[in-house]
UniProtKB/Swiss-Prot annotation:
<dbReference type="GO" id="GO:0005576">
    <property type="term" value="C:extracellular region"/>
</dbReference>
<keyword id="KW-0479">Metal-binding</keyword>
<keyword id="KW-0964">Secreted</keyword>
<protein>
    <recommendedName>
        <fullName>Probable tripeptidyl-peptidase SED3</fullName>
        <ecNumber>3.4.14.10</ecNumber>
    </recommendedName>
</protein>
<dbReference type="Pfam" id="PF09286">
    <property type="entry name" value="Pro-kuma_activ"/>
</dbReference>
<feature type="active site" description="Charge relay system">
    <location>
        <position position="496"/>
    </location>
</feature>
<feature type="binding site">
    <location>
        <position position="572"/>
    </location>
    <ligand>
        <name>Ca(2+)</name>
    </ligand>
</feature>
<keyword id="KW-0843">Virulence</keyword>
<feature type="glycosylation site" description="N-linked (GlcNAc...) asparagine">
    <location>
        <position position="204"/>
    </location>
</feature>
<feature type="glycosylation site" description="N-linked (GlcNAc...) asparagine">
    <location>
        <position position="261"/>
    </location>
</feature>
<feature type="glycosylation site" description="N-linked (GlcNAc...) asparagine">
    <location>
        <position position="295"/>
    </location>
</feature>
<feature type="propeptide" description="Removed in mature form">
    <location>
        <begin position="19"/>
        <end position="198"/>
    </location>
</feature>
<feature type="glycosylation site" description="N-linked (GlcNAc...) asparagine">
    <location>
        <position position="554"/>
    </location>
</feature>
<feature type="glycosylation site" description="N-linked (GlcNAc...) asparagine">
    <location>
        <position position="566"/>
    </location>
</feature>
<keyword id="KW-0865">Zymogen</keyword>
<dbReference type="Pfam" id="PF00082">
    <property type="entry name" value="Peptidase_S8"/>
</dbReference>
<dbReference type="GO" id="GO:0008240">
    <property type="term" value="F:tripeptidyl-peptidase activity"/>
</dbReference>
Length: 593
């Protein structure tokens, strides 16, 4: 039997009586069950869960400044990316901090053999009954309203002994309910259109790799595969990249890339089934354009979702197969030696920022920064809900608010919005953007974003955070992409298309730098807002939409008449600084120190 959110209040009141907070500090506390989820029954007490504990860091600002220095052209440390050993040494907490946490875990009954001390993170496997005693909480199955077959074992609140409060920043999976969404268009409601394979190419109607090459001044440039220049593509939610579809796409739309291929990395029992009948439009789109434009070496990182599970110590039961994919993928990547890391990572998934617990968003953003420190360009699509979909806060206040997206709102990723049409390009109505409510505006954005805010004036005052990190950073075509999936040509739209297209251009720029014996670009944003700015074409037409009175789940929500971020001269929160001009960017990066 499923329980609506208002039914669980007595349960959690009873829980606080059973577990008094004497000498304990609450780490995370959700005001209610997040929208779209209902509570079910408690899990079996013997159910095992794999927990990730983020250790409180004392030198976060110092670390972030190091990342900025490494990534800012002209700085004496530019391009001096850190090795895994150097990064771990920089972030490792004091020994007494680790000892306190490890002692608490062992005294709480966590099997010593299951504990992995990775410095700034500690991972361990524990039963539900032990976790409930240790965190003084109750776990339940929570079910997705739209897809009741999807469930997660979660809680709304947990605490730790007060003596550990400053050492334990976060423990997950506990309060993180949201699941990444594929960034497929949700405002214009474009449907997949099936075409014949000999459709005439018209770049105003259908985008192909050749269209992007012409539009972004790439010409016939084809990079030579280089093991130092790997482009990674993220795969979540049982999206499978099919080799047969990929080869056919190259034959149809990028014959100059014949021979290109990709390998697969399986994270947390993630699979890449070649004969599945499931929709794989997202995976096909991402891998086909990442490689169809770059010819780089490529890896498809498939992270476990709802597919079949092969039990192991970390995931002994099918019902445990609800791990947080961002954390699983990030910890996997950061564990790799330098030579095995991708130089570019493209991800076309995200969720509303407010659906993510605040500590989770900061801890995850720190992991993205760690990838940047090691020389990875982390690229995310900005989302497909324009200024916002529900436009309502999910706290007790329930006020009208534009909805920024995460992880696009993290200052250490490069977020990509969407354009359409050519001569001129225009901002699409669905391209997400705005200003983070969690992450403050980074210094590299100050001039560009403030210029926009000065022109905006009081319009939309109170609906966004003018001091927040601006989204997106850049943009690229995102409408009417031809892909090949399940033996058919399909037309798809969304910032899901923009991200791999932009990532491919970055991979090509990396190839130019490596040929000149220079390091890869790594974390991009200081470059984009600095020396690279002249390599982007400003988009001044079009604008985003949103807040139309109903959410993506068709629930009634506040409407904001004419809500929009307009594309204007300079940076704007729908197209960023603009779309890339490869010819100019290539000249800049070739000699950049």
């Amino acid at each position: 039997m499923l329980l609506r959110w208002h039914s669980v209040i007595p349960l959690f009141l009873a829980m606080t009586v059973a577990f008094p907070n004497t000498y304990r500090t609450v780490v995370e506390d959700l005001p209610a069950i997040p929208e779209g989820w209902v509570q079910g029954n408690p899990p079996s007490p013997e159910t095992s869960v794999r927990m990730n504990l983020a250790v409180g860091q004392q030198n976060t600002r110092t670390f972030e400044q190091i990342v900025l220095d490494i990534s800012t052209p002209g700085h004496r440390n530019y391009g001096k990316h850190l090795s895994r050993r150097d990064l771990k040494g920089l972030l490792r907490p004091r020994r007494e901090t680790s000892n306190l946490i490890l002692s608490w875990l062992e005294k709480s009954g966590v099997p010593k053999r299951s504990i992995v001390d990775d410095g700034d993170w500690i991972h361990f496997v524990i039963s539900i009954s032990q976790a409930e005693r240790m965190l003084q909480t109750r776990f339940y199955h929570f079910h997705d309203v739209q897809d009741p077959g999807i469930s997660m074992i979660r809680t709304l609140k947990y605490s730790v002994p007060s003596r550990l409060a400053r050492h334990v920043y976060m423990i997950q999976p506990t309060t993180k309910f949201g699941k990444p969404k594929k960034h497929a268009n949700s405002i214009a409601n474009l449907q997949a259109i099936y075409l014949s394979t000999n459709a005439t190419e018209n770049c105003n109607a259908t985008i192909t790799p050749r269209c992007l090459r012409e539009l972004y001044k790439m010409g016939d440039y084809v990079a030579k595969p280089d093991c130092r220049n790997v482009i990674g593509v993220s795969g979540y939610l049982d999206q499978y990249a099919r080799y047969s579809d990929f080869y056919k796409f190259l034959e149809l739309y990028a014959p100059e890339m014949k021979g290109a291929n990709f390998s697969v990395a399986h994270i947390g029992n993630g699979q890449n089934l070649q004969n599945s009948t499931r929709n794989s439009i997202e995976a096909s789109l991402d891998i086909e354009y990442a490689l169809g434009l770059s010819n780089a070496s490529a890896v498809f990182y498939t992270t476990s979702g709802r597919g079949p599970l092969v039990p192991d110590l970390d995931q002994p039961e099918q019902e445990h197969n609800s791990n947080e994919p961002y954390l699983d993928q990030l910890h996997y990547l950061l564990s790799l030696p330098q030579e095995a890391l991708p130089a570019v990572l493209s991800t076309s998934y995200g969720e509303n920022e407010q659906s993510v617990p605040e500590r989770f968003s900061h801890a995850t953003c720190n992991l993205f920064a760690q990838l940047g420190a090691r020389g990875v360009s982390v690229i995310f699509s900005s989302g497909d809900s324009g200024v916002g979909s529900s436009c309502l806060t999910n706290d007790k206040k329930k006020i009208t608010r534009f909805n920024p997206t995460f992880p696009a709102s993290c200052p250490f990723v490069t977020s990509v919005g969407a354009t359409f049409k050519i001569n001129p390009e225009r901002a699409t109505g669905f391209s997400s953007g705005g200003f983070s409510d969690r992450h403050s505006r980074p210094g590299y954005q100050n001039d560009a974003v403030q210029h926009y805010l000065d022109k905006l004036g009081d319009r939309w005052k109170g609906l966004y955070n003018p001091k927040g990190r601006g989204i997106p950073d850049v943009s690229a075509q995102g409408a009417n992409f031809a892909i090949y999936d399940h033996g058919k040509v399909i037309i798809v739209s969304g910032t899901s298309a923009s991200a791999p297209a932009f990532a491919a251009i970055i991979a090509n720029l990396n190839a130019i730098r490596l040929r000149a014996n220079k390091p890869v670009l790594g974390y991009l944003n200081p470059f984009i807002y600095g020396k690279g700015r002249e390599g982007f074409t400003d988009i001044v037409h079009g604008g985003s939409k949103g807040c139309v009175g109903y959410s993506s789940t068709n629930r009634s929500t506040p409407a904001v008449p004419y809500a929009s971020w307009n594309a204007t001269e300079g940076w704007d929160p729908v197209t960023g600084v603009g779309t890339p001009n490869f010819r100019i960017l290539a000249k800049i990066v070739q000699h950049m120190e």
